[in-house]
From Swiss-Prot:
Taxon lineage: Bacteria, Bacillati, Bacillota, Clostridia, Eubacteriales
Family: Belongs to the TRAFAC class YlqF/YawG GTPase family. RsgA subfamily.
Protein name: Small ribosomal subunit biogenesis GTPase RsgA
Cellular location(s): Cytoplasm
UniProt cross-references to InterPro entries, sorted A to Z: G_CP_dom (IPR030378), NA-bd_OB-fold (IPR012340), P-loop_NTPase (IPR027417), Ribosome_biogen_GTPase_RsgA (IPR004881), RsgA_GTPase_dom (IPR010914), RsgA_N (IPR031944)
Function: One of several proteins that assist in the late maturation steps of the functional core of the 30S ribosomal subunit. Helps release RbfA from mature subunits. May play a role in the assembly of ribosomal proteins into the subunit. Circularly permuted GTPase that catalyzes slow GTP hydrolysis, GTPase activity is stimulated by the 30S ribosomal subunit.
Gene for this chain: rsgA
Protein source organism: Ruminiclostridium cellulolyticum (strain ATCC 35319 / DSM 5812 / JCM 6584 / H10) (Clostridium cellulolyticum)
Length: 305
């Protein structure tokens, strides 16, 4: 059995890079995967058998254990997420950014926040840095026009499987073309009407970096929902809350209205970004209204920490 990594899957075929030779084989998964409702994903490390060495055809026989799995984008074994926001065109969707950060936190995946197109608006980069640096997130400013940020980004990508995610039209493909030092992805303009990218990525695909590691460009999106987190566990995925949540007066503190809330006190001292905090309240209330949690007592947060 040969070992390899899935680079992409299209129409039921999966393109596997062989570990030893680095040849790429077009493979079909064995029927047992469908029978067990298992779908191979880009990033999966697999065992496969060669059917035709000349034509580079094979069958996927085994999917090795995954260290992580993202649903949207559907990529396995990711250990880093680069979330791309644009300084302008389109304007940043901070709620989407927060949801992506929460998704990464639930899976213990490292995050880079990249602010692209800073040549269009320097102030946005400052806003993002001031809001997210206190939470411990790295913020990288990028501009193709000024050729800024790419050297540092390449250093951060070395040795990782990194997924690029963000709104449509923020310039993910343009960034990838720069860090790959060749044209690898079609880039598209942004529709003025809906501020979404045109002619952009349609599927997740791993691209190998010559200096080590892989990156995955993924279809851009304008909406993203988190529904699998109990509302009283949401606090766990805000790193800037963690120093305070165990010291609130009430064990079941929601950090919204309760007296003696250390998170609110930190907010009042400007140690927590107010806009990000307001979005926390929106997400908390939205999760609380989900039918599976509404009217029910969920597990005590004192137990889950």
């Amino acid at each position: 059995m040969q070992l390899g990594i899935i680079l992409k899957g299209i129409g039921g075929f999966y393109y596997v890079k062989q570990e030893k030779t680095e040849d790429i084989f077009e493979c079909k998964p064995r029927g047992v995967f469908r029978k067990n409702s298992v779908t191979p994903l880009p990033g999966d490390r697999v065992g496969f058998s060669i059917i035709d060495g000349d034509k580079k055809l094979g069958n996927i026989d085994e999917i090795l254990p995954r260290s992580s799995e993202l649903v949207r984008p559907a990529v396995a074994n990711v250990d880093q997420i680069a979330i791309i926001v644009a300084a302008k065109a389109p304007n940043p969707d901070y709620m989407l950014l927060d949801k992506l950060l929460i998704t990464a936190e639930t899976r213990n995946i490292r995050v880079l926040i990249c602010v692209n197109k800073i040549d269009l608006d320097d102030d946005t980069a400052k806003i993002v840095r001031n809001a997210y640096s206190p939470a411990g997130y790295d913020v990288i400013e990028i501009s193709s026009v000024r050729n800024i940020g790419y050297k540092r980004l390449k250093e951060e990508l070395k040795g990782h499987i990194t997924v690029f995610a963000g709104q449509s039209g923020v310039g993910k493909s343009t960034i990838l073309n720069h860090i790959m030092e060749s044209w690898v992805m079609e880039t598209g303009s942004v529709s003025n009407k809906i501020e979404r990218g045109k002619h952009t990525t349609r599927h997740a695909e791993l691209l190998e970096l010559k200096y080590g590691g892989y990156v995955a460009d993924t279809p851009g999106f304008s909406s993203f929902e988190i529904i699998d987190i109990p509302y009283n566990q949401l606090e766990r995925y805000y790193p800037e809350f963690l120093p305070y949540i165990n010291t609130c007066r009430f064990n079941s503190c929601s950090h919204i209205t309760e007296p003696g809330c250390r998170v609110i006190e930190a907010l009042e001292r400007s140690e927590i970004d107010n806009n990000r905090y307001q979005r926390y309240i929106q997400l908390y209330k939205a999760l609380k209204d989900i039918p599976q949690y509404k009217g029910k007592k969920t597990e005590s947060r004192r137990v889950i920490k």
